[in-house]
Amino acid sequence: MATKIDKEACRAAYNLVRDDGSAVIWVTFRYDGATIVPGDQGADYQHFIQQCTDDVRLFAFVRFTTGDAMSKRSKFALITWIGEDVSGLQRAKTGTDKTLVKEVVQNFAKEFVISDRKELEEDFIRSELKKAGGANYDAQSE
C-alpha cells in the first residue's frame, strides 16, 4: 500500500515549530499504518532524542537558535531517524516517503539521515547547521 501524508495536520505542526513565539522547538512525523501523521512535539531537545529508539523510523523538524549575543537566528533541521532494528524494506521506503514530508517541510538549513544516537547530540547538529550557514561573523568569540 502506498504511503500517504496528512498534509493539513503535518503543516499545522510544522508551522508551530517555525513560529518564534511558540515554545515548541521540535515535532516528529510518524507512521500510522500507511499514513504519515504528526507525532510528539516539545520544547526540550532531549525529549526528542528519547523518541528515537532502535525499532522506530520517523522524521523530525527541529528549530535551533544560533548566532551571537548581537544577532540570534533560528535555523531549522529536517532529521530522518532510522533505528538499528528497522527492516531493510522499511529503510528503503523511508527514503521515498521523505518526499511526502518535504511537500510540507520546505524550509530547513540542513537535512540529516541518522541511525546512530551519537549523531543526534545537540552540539553535533548545531555545529553542522553553523557550517551550513556559510560565513562565520562570530570570530571575536573564538
Curated annotation (Swiss-Prot):
- Residue positions of the PTM Phosphoserine? 141
Localization in the cell: Cytoplasm; Cytoplasm, Cytoskeleton; Nucleus
Q: Where is this region: Flexible and important for F-actin binding?
A: 66-75
Example GO CC term: the record gives: cytosol
Q: Which domain of life is it from?
A: Eukaryota
Which InterPro entries does this one have? Answer: ADF-H (IPR002108), ADF-H/Gelsolin-like_dom_sf (IPR029006)
Kindly list the positions at which N6-acetyllysine occurs in this protein.
102
- CDD domains per record: ADF_coactosin_like
Q: Name one GO molecular function term.
A: enzyme binding
**SMART domains per the UniProt record, alphabetical:** ADF (SM00102)
Modified residues annotated as N-acetylalanine in this record: 2
Pfam families given in the database record: Cofilin_ADF
UniProt-listed GO biological process terms: defense response to fungus
Q: Which UniProt keywords apply?
A: Acetylation, Actin-binding, Chaperone, Cytoplasm, Cytoskeleton, Nucleus, Phosphoprotein
**In what residue span(s) does the ADF-H domain sit?**
2-130
Summarize subunit and interaction data from the UniProt record for this chain.
Interacts with 5-lipoxygenase (ALOX5/5LO) in a calcium-independent manner. Binds to F-actin with a stoichiometry of 1:2.
This chain's function reads: Binds to F-actin in a calcium-independent manner. Has no direct effect on actin depolymerization. Acts as a chaperone for ALOX5 (5LO), influencing both its stability and activity in leukotrienes synthesis.
Q: Which PANTHER family match?
A: COACTOSIN-LIKE PROTEIN, CORTACTIN AND DREBRIN
Q: Which family does it belong to?
A: Belongs to the actin-binding proteins ADF family. Coactosin subfamily.
The protein in question is named Coactosin-like protein
Origin species, per record, is: Mus musculus (Mouse)
Q: Which gene encodes it?
A: Cotl1
